[in-house]
Amino acid sequence: MKLSLSPPPYADAPVVVLISGLGGSGSYWLPQLAVLDQEYQVVCYDQRGTGNNPDTLAEDYSIAQMAAELHQALVAAGIERYAVVGHALGALVGMQLALDYPASVTVLVSVNGWLRINTHTRRCFQVREQLLHSGGAQAWVEAQPLFLYPADWMAARAPRLEAEDALALAHFQGKNNLLRRLNALKRADFSHHADRIRCPVQIICASDDLLVPTACSSELHAALPDSQKMVMRYGGHACNVTDPETFNALLLNGLASLLHHREAAL
């Protein structure tokens, strides 16, 4: 699996791995790259079955497989210890990595994540699946911003959204791959295992997230032994895109604090 690695800003700089959500594209994290590159070696990638890592996914494709193939690719690149920043599905992959490779994951940042899918989130995906089946890729892509962004943010950026729609449609991961990745997301359940995650965790959520209620992050915070929760008042599900200044400040402070906390505990 192809990875994109930034040059380390200094010798032995900590590594931060960015894992996007259901869309799977590493470019999702573009608003974070410039600030992270100054302090960390950053790893981005298109998830298997998407972008520049095309593949046909098995029907039983799982979050555990997503975690294993990423860890194997990191080890092959010479990276054995790393922090993880995951958004939604990416946060699930991050938790799986922390469970399966505890010696490798130094810190976990969960952005609008959850322990197991909330009934509201499931309802949103049911609607989106119906759109996919009835209207194809174009209907899925055109509806997606409604679940990602605040209404006023979208209204002020209509040309940008049109361009994003065209790009997303041109690089659509395919109906079968999308549904198999979505099914993996829906099956994931960390409610009985989260207390085994021992690395420090930063939880970031947005209070106006239409797709994932903030209660999901509260449940995560209660279940994870060493976690802290930060709530953004604005930004929607893709708060790192819509309000990168606020998000980046939270992320940079959290990573620095938790990595120091981790090293002090060793």
Curated annotation (Swiss-Prot):
Belongs to the AB hydrolase superfamily. Hydrolase RutD family. One of its GO terms (molecular function) is hydrolase activity, acting on carbon-nitrogen (but not peptide) bonds, in linear amides. The lineage of its organism: Bacteria, Pseudomonadati, Pseudomonadota, Gammaproteobacteria, Enterobacterales. Involved in pyrimidine catabolism. May facilitate the hydrolysis of carbamate, a reaction that can also occur spontaneously. Keywords: Hydrolase. Its EC number is 3.5.1.-. This is Putative carbamate hydrolase RutD. Coiled coil: none annotated.
